[in-house]
Amino acid sequence: MSDIKVAIIGAGSMAREHIKAFAAIPGVKVVGIQSRTASKAQALAKEFAIPKVIEDLKDLYTETKADIVVITVNILAMLDVAGEVVKHPWVCLFEKPVGLHYAESVQINELAKAQNAKCYVGLNRRHYSSTKTVLADLALSDEKRIINVFDQEDPYIALHEDKQPALVVENWMYANSIHMIDYFRVLCRGTIQSVTPLVHWDSNNPSLVVTKIEFSSGDTGIYQAVWNSPGPWAVTVTTHAKRWEMRPLEQASYQLHGTRKIEPAPVHEWDKEFKAGFRLQAEETIKALQGLPHALPTLEDSLETMHLIKAIYEI
């Protein structure tokens, strides 16, 4: 059986983590890389023995005949890159978010549908061993769940220290809060029935955002974000019998009813050796390519998370 071939678009830190994850799977080869910054692409190609550095994105498929392409470009380039990659018969794995904002995500989704492209999104926290552990335990009970998601964002740091483009920072709830808001769609059952802002987003004075989300299952989500103030990235899931907490997100711990002791759950070795979630995500991408059951979110699935962000922030 021939090797599964993977191509990479982009040459930043995320590209590097994807290369490591795919290259670790037996029978998978990273065969080409393309980036607007050729020197970075060449450096990664040298480090990971990638045989081809492609100058023009339009030549990437014909030069590599890759089975999978991983798109790790800056959000501002996502629309143009998506318009090109969906033309080819490979499986597309997009880094999140797929678009600068909800409207652009809709546009990209329409481009993919028009080409009948196979598109998935790297919402890697869905593949954390902590997330999998919590979901497996919750599946054993039909008790109602209260999911609290705690978000913290620093747009000033993103703009001035991390040198993110101003337009990206203006849409920072899509660019970065997607990491946290997607947890509602993973941990809550059923469909969203209502999104009720309790403390409204103020774009002129980014501070506190609190929103209640009701699901058809009876599950309730509470989103609390602090902007330009200290706070954790954390998730809790409370049922009558047990409370789960992920703080940090890579570590799940639980507390049983009637006790005060917090018990940590084991963390999978893959989440220590690779960027958390990436190794399993790569495996799931291979399954999607092979037509096997898999846990990758589709482009349309991620669009629902983008829509939830829009509703929470009333934008």
Model regions and ranges:
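Contiguous beta-strand/loop segments that form the cofactor/metal-binding neighborhood of enzyme cores
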Residues: 175-251, 283-292
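Active-site loop of classical SDR/Rossmann-like NAD(P)-dependent oxidoreductases
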Residues: 269-283
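C-terminal helix-rich "cap/oligomerization" subdomain common to oxidoreductases
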Residues: 1, 68-73, 117, 216, ...
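Beta-loop-alpha module in the N-terminal Rossmann-like domain of NAD(P)-dependent dehydrogenases
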Residues: 39, 48, 52-111
